[in-house]
Regions:
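NAD(P)-cofactor binding segment of oxidoreductase domains
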Residues: 1-23
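Active-site "gating" loop of Rossmann-like NAD(P)-dependent oxidoreductase/epimerase domains
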Residues: 26-50, 65
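Conserved beta-loop-beta element that borders a ligand/cofactor-binding pocket
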Residues: 58-82
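Substrate-positioning beta->alpha
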Residues: 79-89, 98-121, 127
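Mid/C-terminal beta-alpha module of Rossmann-like enzyme folds, strongest
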Residues: 114-117, 122-169
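Conserved C-terminal active-site "lid" loop/helix of NAD(P)H-dependent oxidoreductases
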Residues: 144, 163-191
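Amphipathic terminal alpha-helices
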Residues: 195-208
């Protein structure tokens, strides 16, 4: 579960906050071989860290019901933004184009996480929301687009099978899914500032 809830459940309940948000991960869905998932998709976490997130989500939702408090769960995809993006990898000389056919990743700009949370605070409820952009995309495409914007040659493609990866990095490629963000748009009226990686990288280029 969540150590904050474990330690301070009574204090939180006693304070009767008007809104509670817990930031989780789309990793709770596990692998779906590239198929679309939404908030109603049964959870099937693969990694230990995602199993722990499921336990934390369940604890917060139970806490919400027991105490009649609004708790919103936000399942975030891969976070990027200033200081954490494809350009940084080029700057550090670590940019690689790993290719695993059919593999996509889901992403979210940090500014859109903040925007979604702000929209949610205005509409307290006990609800789960995916916070991810409109376009799950192959990681090698993101690297190639960043290279194009920088005016440099893209790194050569490296087959996933032969790539030198840490166990954690390799584990991310064991999960392949496309995560829907329709609920956060429909129910919170949220409009993404960076609906895909192209829009975001063009904006981030100005900060490089």
């Amino acid at each position: 579960g969540d150590p904050v809830l474990n330690q301070y459940a009574n204090e939180i309940a006693g304070a009767k906050p008007r809104w509670i948000g817990y930031l989780s991960t789309v990793g709770v869905y596990g692998n779906h071989d590239g198929a679309w998932v939404d908030e109603e998709t049964p959870l099937n976490p693969v990694s230990k860290r995602s199993v722990q997130r499921v336990a934390a989500e369940e604890a917060w939702l139970a806490f919400a019901e027991q105490n009649d408090l609004p708790v919103q769960i936000f399942r975030l995809s891969g976070i990027y933004g200033p200081g954490r993006n494809a350009f940084e990898n080029f700057r550090k000389g670590t940019a690689r184009r790993l290719v695993k056919p059919g593999q996509v990743f889901n992403r979210i700009h940090v500014a859109d996480i903040a925007g979604a949370l702000k929209a949610a605070m205005a509409k307290p409820s006990t609800r789960v929301f995916n916070v991810t952009d409109d376009e799950p995309a192959p990681p090698q495409d993101v690297v190639a687009f960043a290279a194009e914007l920088l005016g440099v040659e893209a790194p050569p493609e490296i087959p996933f099978e032969t790539a030198d990866l840490t166990p954690m990095a390799r584990s991310f490629y064991g999960e392949n899914k496309r995560v829907s963000n329709q609920r956060v748009k429909d129910e919170l009226g949220f409009t993404f500032r960076y609906p895909d990686y192209r829009v975001a990288l063009k904006a981030l280029l100005e900060t490089v």
